[in-house]
Amino acid sequence: MPQPESQPQMLIERLGLLPHPEGGHYRETYRSTTKVATPRGERCASTAIVFLLTAGQCSHWHRICADELWLHQGGGGLLIHELSPAGAYRRTRLGLDLAAGETPQHLVPAGHWFGSEPAAGVGWSLVGCTVAPGFEFVDFSLARPEDLAPIAAAFPNWRRLCLATEPQVLPRLSPPATQA
């Protein structure tokens, strides 16, 4: 049995995870062959990834043009921060400790800004994310500070999750090479 501190590295290696442009590590595990029409063009009906965040990492504020269902798969709780198009802030704790208020799955609706991070004291969190219609990098936007102004008072640390304030990281924002 691996030591807790080696668990994330073992997951990265065994699951074949790659760095994700929004933070953390991921691997696409499913891409539907069924196509659907959307206002942005044809998309796969659904896609899925496994996604790992470790202590000190975060999924930077971003939004996509489709619903995204988050499912807790391992490790500790994960905080999902969300800003609706109307400016309402919501925080959800994803995990399996129902007595502590965690939920095993959470839907982030299309068009919401959101970011995530392991809860305080959590070493790592592994989740599955399913997007419908399917994810395409062309439908992915990283937040700028002005996009998140409505939550500045309610969530004073929002800038910590905002990649757009860290231009040295932006060159990573390109879709991963498709593996055959």
Where are these regions (language model features)?
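Histidine-centered acyl-transfer/condensation active-site motif
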Residues: 130
